[in-house]
């Protein structure tokens, strides 16, 4: 066993998450780094229990062979969640503390909005958590704050540019963009050459431009109706979903309707998650499209001259944050993109660094948001395309509770007591719901990976119900199916899962297969994904048709697709449980995160700014003023 890992003594019943987290004294993060053989030159400390791992750590280990790569998805969940994060952490505790393997957990950074709202935190649960969990769930090392700042700088640049273009002639605008120096000479800043190149202007001096070229260069002529970029903040605030800006007396009546999204919905978060280097991040940030000109041309952050400044604000955020689990295994926390309008996976750079750190025979386990129809699909078709990495094993987390729901059980509603059907034995209801599990197994196997079903056991589950899930999983083609009790028993409760994962990784026989090639049309890619859901066809609204035509004309049809749909059904209708088929998938709109690198069709209506419930989680949260420890965080 490594020097940093430990085995917990557990008690029953399982205490509250925050009480368990506070009962374990974390190791100084330098001890975790030392156990991973990270040179102190390659990380920066953020207090005692967090460190930023620098990209230079990857550069130093480039010759090192990668470890095994494992992704954790799940069946179609209930609104309560089925424990993917807890299973991810529990598995890694089993691999590191009980099976003596080198392992790194790679997780998304949670938004503080849901932490204070209805969902609570995302550090795992019970005896399988990331600690300190209050630091994990709140500010961490400031990455989300950096995203908020850079996103809003770009938003300010957009409206400011419209304002100044409205009130100035072409010549006056150009003269202010390229002011003379003390010697009276004008010059272009470095970022301006990006726009000149885009316009096909090869001249290097402002004095050489013709009046027509001056107009093309200086006047972006942004169509306000086309602007898709919104301001963000990391708080659930429903009253900011739709606002009017520009109502001050100095703005000369230039009002515009817009709104706020939650920070993790920003395209900059998706860029952070999909970037592979600082240079790559600079290019992606500069290519972000904020809207169109009145002539229909895409306007980018680099056109506004702000791409470099955005990168400067994000320069520290590109480095993953090192933390630890309750049992002392290492965790890299990095990026937290939405799983609907974005791809819902932690960062590529964290995974790449982790795979080098664990080396041959080690394990990197990462979680994909929502069910495997969404999270694992996007992991394979978007994240793995850009990273060039290939997973050997995919886990599908299932619960008896969710399977009963898919078998026809009563609705599961967050905040309400569970119906008796979910806390008493009903094997036939479980078996009926296994059609959902079978669909997730077959979909995931199609990528060429070995699939393991991890049955996340609850105290009310019976042996007969658990055995039914295991049998059905094996009959459906799973490599293995394992019952886990890591929530109640820490890594010890996931040892069998760890053994199964090792066997699955050692016995991979197929290459990674994508669901679709990139060189087909946008509609063809959408329809390939819809078919994997069980749809018989796709129906496009007039708006969706218009957007697909626009993105194709603008040269973006070769990007992967990031479907934005409900996580509560394979279909577009959250009420359709099990494995619905033969439905027509409606595409309401199609939008693009061009800098991040994907097109996202909207299936139904998606909120990008959550609201607070009547009784938010913040009612439970307080601080012990004597010890400084947080109470009530979950």
Curated annotation (Swiss-Prot):
CDD domains, per database record: FTHFS
Catalyzed reactions: (6S)-5,6,7,8-tetrahydrofolate + formate + ATP = (6R)-10-formyltetrahydrofolate + ADP + phosphate
Keywords recorded for this protein, A-Z: ATP-binding, Ligase, Nucleotide-binding, One-carbon metabolism
GO BP terms in the entry: tetrahydrofolate interconversion
Enzyme class: ligase
A GO molecular-function annotation: formate-tetrahydrofolate ligase activity
Protein name: Formate--tetrahydrofolate ligase
Gene: THFS
């Amino acid at each position: 066993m490594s020097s940093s890992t430990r085995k917990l003594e557990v008690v029953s019943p399982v205490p509250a998450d925050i009480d368990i987290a506070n009962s374990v004294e974390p190791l100084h993060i330098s001890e975790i780094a030392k156990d991973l053989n990270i040179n102190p030159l390659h990380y920066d400390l953020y207090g005692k229990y967090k460190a930023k791992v620098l990209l230079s750590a990857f550069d130093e280990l480039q010759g090192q062979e990668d470890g095994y790569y494992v992704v954790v998805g799940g069946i179609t969940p209930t609104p309560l969640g089925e424990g993917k994060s807890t299973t991810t952490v529990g598995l890694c505790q089993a691999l590191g503390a009980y099976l003596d393997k080198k392992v790194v957990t790679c997780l998304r950074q949670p938004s503080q909005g849901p932490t204070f709202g209805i969902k609570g935190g995302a550090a795992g649960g019970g005896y399988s958590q990331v600690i300190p969990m209050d630091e994990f769930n709140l500010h961490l090392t400031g990455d989300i704050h950096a995203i908020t700042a850079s996103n809003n700088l770009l938003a300010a640049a957009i409206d400011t540019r419209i304002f100044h273009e409205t009130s100035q002639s072409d010549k006056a605008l150009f003269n202010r963009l390229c002011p003379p120096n003390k010697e009276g000479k004008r010059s272009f800043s470095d970022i301006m050459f990006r726009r000149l190149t885009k316009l096909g202007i090869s001249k290097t001096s402002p004095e050489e431009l013709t009046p027509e070229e001056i107009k093309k260069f200086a006047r972006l002529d942004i169509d306000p109706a086309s602007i898709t970029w919104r301001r963000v903040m990391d708080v659930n605030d429903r009253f900011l979903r739709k606002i009017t800006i520009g109502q001050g007396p100095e703005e000369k009546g230039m009002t515009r309707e817009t709104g706020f999204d939650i920070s993790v919905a920003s395209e900059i978060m998706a860029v952070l998650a999909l970037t592979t280097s600082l240079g790559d991040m600079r290019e992606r940030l500069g290519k972000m499209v904020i809207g169109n000109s009145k002539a229909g041309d895409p306007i980018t952050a680099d056109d506004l001259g702000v791409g470099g400044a955005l990168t400067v604000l994000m320069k520290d955020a590109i480095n993953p944050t090192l933390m630890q689990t309750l049992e002392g295994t290492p965790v890299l926390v990095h990026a937290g993109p939405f799983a609907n309008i974005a791809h819902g996976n932690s960062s590529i750079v964290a995974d790449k660094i982790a795979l080098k750190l664990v080396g041959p025979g080690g394990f990197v386990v990462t979680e994909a948001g929502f069910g495997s129809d969404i999270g694992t699909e996007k992991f394979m078709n978007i994240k793995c395309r850009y990273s060039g990495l290939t997973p050997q094993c995919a886990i599908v987390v299932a619960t008896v509770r969710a399977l009963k729901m898919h078998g026809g059980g009563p609705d599961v509603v967050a905040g309400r007591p569970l119906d008796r059907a979910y806390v008493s034995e009903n094997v036939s209801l479980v078996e009926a719901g296994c059609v959902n599990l079978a669909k997730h197994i077959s979909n995931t196997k199609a990528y060429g990976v070995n699939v393991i079903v991890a049955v996340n056991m609850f105290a009310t589950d019976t042996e007969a119900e658990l055995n039914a899930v295991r049998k059905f999983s094996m009959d459906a083609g799973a490599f293995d199916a394992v019952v886990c009790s890591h929530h109640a028993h820490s890594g010890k409760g996931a040892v069998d899962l760890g053994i199964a994962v090792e066997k699955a990784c050692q016995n991979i026989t197929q290459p990674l297969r994508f669901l679709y090639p990139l060189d087909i049309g946008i509609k063809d890619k959408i329809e390939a994904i819809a078919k994997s859901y069980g749809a018989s066809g796709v129906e496009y609204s007039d708006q969706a048709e218009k957007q697909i035509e626009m993105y194709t004309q603008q040269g973006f049809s070769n990007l992967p697709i990031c479907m934005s749909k409900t996580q509560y059904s394979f279909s577009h209708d959250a009420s359709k449980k099990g494995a619905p088929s033969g439905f027509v998938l409606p595409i309401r709109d199609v939008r693009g995160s061009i800098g991040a690198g994907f097109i996202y069709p909207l299936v139904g209506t998606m909120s990008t700014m959550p609201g607070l419930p009547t009784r938010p989680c913040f009612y439970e949260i307080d601080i012990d003023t004597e010890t400084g420890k947080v109470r009530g965080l979950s």
